[in-house]
Swiss-Prot record:
Belongs to the ectatomin family. Ectatomin-Eq subfamily. This is U1-ectatotoxin-Eb1a subunit B. It is found in: Secreted; Target cell membrane. GO terms for molecular function: toxin activity.
Amino acid sequence: FAIGAIIKKFGKKLVEYAVKHKDLYAPYIKKHLCEKL
């Protein structure tokens, strides 16, 4: 499917949701990035 279209349609809401809930996924992302590095 077209990811670009989805981002255009939901991008702003996704960004707002991400900012609001960043404390939920930030530790996971840090852990994931550290494992990759």
